[in-house]
Amino acid sequence: VEVQAEGETLKLDFTTEAETFFVDAARYGLVADGETDNTVRLQAALSTCPKGGTVYVPAGRYRTASLFMKSNTTLYLEKGAVLLGDNDRTHYPILPGVLPSENEVDEYYLTGWEGNPLDSFAGLLNITQVHDVVVTGEGTLDCDAQNGDWWVNPKVKRIAWRPRAVAAVDSENICLHGITVQNSYSWTIHPVFVKHLDLLNFNINNPYNAPNTD
């Protein structure tokens, strides 16, 4: 890449890593009607994506609960692709605040609420104890929280504490690029113990009256 300005030329040489596999999530039976639960189908695509591969989600509205990324993979949301959060909180897994070790001394932080390691629902997109993950494209993560009960009495714990839109914990080399994240259940992007996190050219859209969606 070369840039010329004020008589000077600046040059940057770089090499992008090769994409090993292109995984079309539509082949896993996605139903783009905005109503059918696609959680298992989408997770199957993410979980079976080989190292260095990209999971491609075409345009459409895909209802889903929590999804979990794996290391060395990319999630590409095509323009017009919307991952639409499930409105039923009982469809979301609950993550323990901490996991104790066998020696009963060490603990592993998994999630929390307002600074405390408390059991919470898993987010719409979870990046947990992984590395080299990219989420990119012009698509949207829409938690659709306004159409559930997530914003009703938000300080009251119901089953577990509210999830995040994107929850990243104990991970490294994470990039969110180009996407839109909106209508979050609570905090929108929540990184904890994350090294080398890039947030590039992406949008956050939450209504002014949405509680704690900063």
Regions found by a protein language model. Give the residues of each.
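Extracellular/periplasmic carbohydrate-active domains that bind, remodel
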Residues: 1-214
